[in-house]
Structure formats: C-alpha cells, structure tokens
C-alpha cells in the first residue's frame, strides 16, 4: 500500500511530461529553450540526488524525503500558474527538479530493504509497472483535458492536486524500515562468492585440473556507470524533443492535436507490458546479459525512426507510434535490470549515485536533443541517439 502515493505522483508527472514542452512553445518559447530548461534542471539535480541519497542512508530515515519531494512539487506546480515568462518558468522548474529527486533514492532503498535479493527484480518490476500505470493515466488525462479545451492554468492546478494527493497518502502509508541490512548482506555474499571461486580455481590449478576462469572476475563498476550515462544521454537526446516531433507529424497528417497525448499513452502502455513481463522473470543470472541486448535493440529502433521522413503523413504517425511502444517496453525491462544491479554494485551510503548517473546523461541529452533538432533536423537526432545507444551497449558488454 505504501506505493499508492507514488502512483498519484507519477500520474501528475505523466500529464506534465507532454504538457510542459507544448506549454513552453505556446508562451513563445523555442526548442532551444526547452532544451535549456530540461538540461539546467537536470544538472542542478545531479549533486542533490547524491545528497538526498547520502542523507537518507546516513540517518536511516526515508519517509521525510519522500514527503519533501511530493509537497515541493505541489507548491511549485501551483506557482507555475502565475507565470507566462519562459525565463521564470525555467527557474521554477529547476527548483522543482532539485527537490523532486529527493524521493528517488529513498524509494529504491525501501524496495531493496523491504524485500530479499531474490525478490528485487520482481519488486522493482511491480513498483515500476504500478507507477507506470499512473503515468499512463496521467497521459490519458492530458488527452481528455486537451480535448475538453482546458486552459494551461487549469491543467497545472490539476497536476498540483495530484501531487498533493500523493503527499497525503504517503504521509499515512509510508513507513521507514525497522532494520536496514539487506544491501549489506548482498555485498558480503558477493565478496564471499568471489573469494570461494578464487580458492576453487587456485586449488584446481595446483592439482593440475584444467578450469575455465572466464567467470572469475569482478563486476566492472566503471563500465556499468558509463553505460548508464550513455543510455540516459541517448534517451534524452531522443525523447526531449519527441513531443514536438510527434506534434509536427500529427499536424501534417491533419489529425487532432490531442492525438499527441494518445501516442505517448501507447508508449507508456508498452512500458506496462514490459514491467508485467519483468515480474515473471526470476533468473537473476541473465540480468547482465539481457541488459546489453536491450540497449542494442533500443539503438536499432532509434535508427528505424529515420524511415518516418520517407513515409506519407499517416504512415509516419503509425510507424512513430509503433516504435515508441517498443521503446516503452524495452525501457521497462532495462530499468528493472539496472535498478536491481545498482543495489548490488553501489554501496550503502551512495544510493543516490544511480540517479546522479542518469541525471548526468539526461542533462546532456536534454540540451543536445532540442539543439540538434532545431539546428539540423530530427533525422540527425535519430542518428545521434542510435549511435550513443550502441556505445552504451558496448559499455554494458564490458560490465
């Protein structure tokens, strides 16, 4: 039940994710200013992600940071309604991002500490799938509000209200774990397993027995971190300007503007399917290898978007929608895998590092994506994203 507040929080941010770029354009902003807003917000949230993770691990208190995140989102979204200045909007959004990430590390730790290691994949998959449904409903609400011609202020009030509900529910339902030890046990188990395999191989070699040493190596944490940054970079390059791209091809096809939200609803639906599948997979040993394959497929489908420019207006909308559904599916599986792996390889006290790495890549991609789209066109965006996805694939193969 403690996840219920996060459900409403994601509902609000699902609605905001598509509405905000369109709102910036509506008040006279440009693709470049969207990129600046997203990248500045992410850059400022990077050090605070690490700070929130350090503080919650140090004090063994997680609920207070979740409440801070949801309450801050409520207040700042309300303040959004008083501005039509792009510069002021960028400032408010940056402050909101700094406080918004306060719930990320505590949420990951709660899942890791409330469940045993063998259930981490299923637990992360259930959480992400459950909140993805909230995100999907938020997108549907955006479609409905757009169809009903709600103005910008009413939409922002609605987003703020959803975050207020999230705050109140979390105030009642979220509890700090009585004991925090599961991640420490996993770290000890990995060290003991590594040592026992080393002793076995050494004794076998002394006895003259031929053994394979291909599995006798520690995880390459640097490669894992590099892969996360590159994956986040490619994703942000592709998805930051994506609402504008979808809006353009929908207009070209003479379809209703509300269809933009519908396309991203289907993208989110692909994510829900991915999380449902992840809950059924229990083979922990396949997590590392499957992660690299998922990244490779993301790269291939990014290149597939190049075909959109060669098709008729209606066909381009159909292909873009299909690719976004697959992207949602692959991203869900990737996120479950990497969250579980991060709880193994990132030590306690640094639980915010996962969000820092995602933020570093996201900040760069949020700036580069709109800049490339505005300067060179969306075709270059798709090529660049595909190349960076393939570089991320190489990093995860090394890991």
What kind of region is each of these model predictions?
Residues 176-225:
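Juxtamembrane intracellular "pre-TM" segments in multi-pass secondary transporters
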Residues 64-78, 289-305:
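Structural signature of the two symmetry-related core transmembrane helices
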Residues 1-43, 220-227, 232-261:
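Helix-loop boundary and gating motifs at the non-cytosolic
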Residues 94-133:
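Cytoplasmic helix-loop-helix junction between adjacent transmembrane helices
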Residues 48-60, 274-287, 373:
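Helix-to-loop junctions at the C-terminal end of transmembrane segments
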Residues 36-54, 262-277:
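Central cavity-lining transmembrane alpha-helices of secondary-active solute carriers
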Residues 347-376:
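A late C-terminal transmembrane helix in Major Facilitator Superfamily
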Residues 102-115, 331-346:
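Intracellular juxtamembrane helix-capping segments at the cytosolic ends
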């Amino acid at each position: 039940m403690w996840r219920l507040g996060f459900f409403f929080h994601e509902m609000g941010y699902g609605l905001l994710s598509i509405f905000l770029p369109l709102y910036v354009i509506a008040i006279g902003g440009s693709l470049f200013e969207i990129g600046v807003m997203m990248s500045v917000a992410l850059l400022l949230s990077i050090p605070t992600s690490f700070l929130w993770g350090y503080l919650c691990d140090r004090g063994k208190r997680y609920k207070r940071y979740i409440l801070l995140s949801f309450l801050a989102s409520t207040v700042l979204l309300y303040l959004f309604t008083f501005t039509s200045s792009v510069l002021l909007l960028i400032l408010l959004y940056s402050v909101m991002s700094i406080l918004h990430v306060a719930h990320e590390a505590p949420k990951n730790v709660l899942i890791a500490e409330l469940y045993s290691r063998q259930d981490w994949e299923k637990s992360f998959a259930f959480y992400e799938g459950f909140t993805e449904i909230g995100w999907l409903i938020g997108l549907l609400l955006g479609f409905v509000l757009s169809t009903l011609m709600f103005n910008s202020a009413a939409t922002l009030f609605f987003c703020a209200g959803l975050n207020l509900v999230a705050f109140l529910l979390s105030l009642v339902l979220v509890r700090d774990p009585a004991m925090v030890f599961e991640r420490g046990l996993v770290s000890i188990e990995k060290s003991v397993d590594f040592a026992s395999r080393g002793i076995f191989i050494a004794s076998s070699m002394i006895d003259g027995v031929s053994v394979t040493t291909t599995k006798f190596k520690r995880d390459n944490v640097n490669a894992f971190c590099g892969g996360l940054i590159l994956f986040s970079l490619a994703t942000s390059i592709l998805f930051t300007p994506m609402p504008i791209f979808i809006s353009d091809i929908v207009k070209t096809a003479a379809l209703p503007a509300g269809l933009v939200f519908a396309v991203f609803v289907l993208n989110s639906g692909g994510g829900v399917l991915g999380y449902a599948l992840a809950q059924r997979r229990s083979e922990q040993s396949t997590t590392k290898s499957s992660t690299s394959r998922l990244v490779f497929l993301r790269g291939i489908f990014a290149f597939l978007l190049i075909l959109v420019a060669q098709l008729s207006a209606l066909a381009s909308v159909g292909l873009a929608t299909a690719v976004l559904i697959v992207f949602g599916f692959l991203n869900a599986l990737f996120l479950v895998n990497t969250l579980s792996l991060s709880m193994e390889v990132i030590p306690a006290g640094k639980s915010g590092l996962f969000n820092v790495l995602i933020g570093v890549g996201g900040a760069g991609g949020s700036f580069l994506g709109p800049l490339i789209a505005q300067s060179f066109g969306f075709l270059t965006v798709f090529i660049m994203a595909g190349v960076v996805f393939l570089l991320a694939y190489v990093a995860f193969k090394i890991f």
